[in-house]
Regions:
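Short hydrophobic/aromatic beta-strand immediately N-terminal to the Walker A/P-loop
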Residues: 50-53, 76, 379
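A contiguous, basic/glycine-rich beta-loop/short-helix subdomain that forms a polymer-engagement track
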Residues: 167-202, 213-221, 299-399
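Conserved pre-motif I regulatory segment
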Residues: 3-52
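Short glycine-/polar-rich loops that comprise or flank the Walker A/P-loop
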Residues: 73, 102-105, 225-228, 374-376
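The conserved Walker
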Residues: 56
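A substrate-engagement module of RecA-like helicase motors
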Residues: 2-23, 73-202, 207, 301, ...
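Signature of the SF2 helicase/ATPase Hel1-core->accessory helical subdomain module
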Residues: 70, 86, 91-94, 173-174, ...
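Walker A/P-loop NTP-binding motif
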Residues: 41-42, 61-74, 91-95
Length: 399
């Protein structure tokens, strides 16, 4: 379909006698909405990047949903908040599909902390050191998991993280064993990603999009499939999220999680009591150096743990993964101690908890390299993009 004919068709949908008015009670045709939808449709057909500010009341959601659901392209709709994700998935998209008489396959893909990790649930239940209060909650999760269709923790009857067991039943990217996991075939996250691969339209979030851009730029795999069209609602949040995603973070909690995971694996092996004891003593040195805010000494002490983990790399899939995680932490500490060109390092603290961070000084260049260079047209929308009526600052931050 030509650019003009596609844009004309989209325009007709918004008219007082169009598809939306016929199917949606109370619909009012607004010229600003029609114009925005036309701009979006044109960009989708011609390619490129559209940066558009849509003030509250413009109706930007309909302005991008109609062309997104009318086109034949594979589309990603990314948001900053879960509330908007749910609104799109369960209210807006079904309503617009019905109004237009179209039936595109739609999938929702969330971050990994929203999905049950069967392997970590199993390990937590098998751990004899699991506290009675935690075991009770874990058993409730286990019962729910047997009946859950998708393993999305949103359908759990209680908040697992508020109950103190969230980290025991989910896996971070560092903890995930990937295709080597014994639960790969029944993993809720894998199934959600497969559904996204097969869908015409995927609803997701900015953090996941940026994580995917980071992985693809380094040839380390992918989180999301490739898309012809990427629509970023609530786009104003992208630059700040990019600072975090394309930087590095080292907190004592991250190091402690690694140590606890390593201890659990060594305990399971049954014949590594000496290494288990040595690592505990070495981690105490890491902990002391971190609390004394001596990151250089943290690095030296941590390298001993890296060596210990690497020496046991071949013992199991889990020890190999832990060795990789230890090396990744080592590289992050080194980068923070000696920031590469274009990056800045700093320290944040909350009470006694400190985090050392590294981030790009300017987000524009890194977004240009890792995101906008991809073979997809991009549509960036927000109610707040201009400053003093100008897009100049936003354009600089977006690259």
């Amino acid at each position: 379909m030509s650019v003009d004919s596609f844009s004309s068709r989209i325009s007709r949908d918004f008219q007082p006698d169009g598809a939306l008015a016929a199917a949606m009670p109370g619909y009012v045709c607004r010229s600003e909405q029609v114009d925005l939808a036309g701009e979006i449709a044109g960009t989708m057909q011609q390619g490129g990047l559209l940066l558009a500010e849509a003030e509250t009341g413009t109706g930007k959601t309909l302005a991008y949903l109609v062309p997104a659901l009318r086109c034949a392209d594979k589309v990603l709709i990314s948001t900053h908040t879960k509330a908007l994700q749910d609104q799109l998935m369960y209210r807006d998209i079904p309503t617009v599909q019905k109004a237009l008489g179209v039936r595109r396959r739609v999938a929702l893909l969330k971050g990994r902390s929203n999905y049950l990790c069967p392997q970590r649930l199993e390990k937590s239940l098998q751990d004899v050191k699991t506290e009675p209060w935690a075991r009770r909650s874990l058993l409730r999760v286990n019962e729910w998991a047997g009946n859950s269709r998708d393993g999305d923790l949103a359908s759990l009857s209680f908040d697992a993280f508020a109950a103190g067991i969230g980290s025991r039943i989910t896996a971070t990217a560092e903890q995930c064993l990937g295709s080597k996991c014994s639960h790969w075939d029944d993993c809720p996250l894998v199934k959600a990603r497969q559904a996204a691969q097969e869908a015409d339209v995927v609803v997701s979030n900015h953090s996941l999009l940026l994580a995917d851009a980071q992985l693809k730029s380094g040839d380390f795999g992918e989180v999301l499939p490739d898309f012809d069209v990427t629509i970023l609602d609530e786009a104003h949040a992208i630059p700040d999220l990019a600072c975090r995603q394309f930087g590095r973070q080292v907190a004592l909690s991250r190091l402690t999680t690694w140590h606890n995971d390593m201890q659990a694996v060594l305990e399971g092996l049954g014949d590594e009591a000496e290494l288990k004891r040595d690592m505990t003593m070495q981690f105490m040195r890491v902990n002391e150096a971190f609390e004394a805010d001596k990151l250089g000494e943290v690095l030296v002490a941590w390298q001993e743990l890296v060596a210990g983990a690497d020496a046991r790399r071949e013992r199991s899939t889990e020890t190999a993964k832990l060795a990789d995680r230890a090396e990744a932490i080592e590289l992050d500490i080194e980068a923070i101690l000696t920031p590469p060109k274009g990056y800045v390092a700093w320290r944040e603290s909350s009470g006694r908890a400190a985090t050392h961070l590294l981030a790009p000084v300017e987000t524009g260049p890194v977004l240009g390299e890792k995101l906008w260079s991809r073979a997809s047209c991009f549509i960036l929308l927000s109610a707040t993009l201009r400053i003093s009526g100008s897009f100049a600052y936003a354009a600089e931050r977006f690259g």
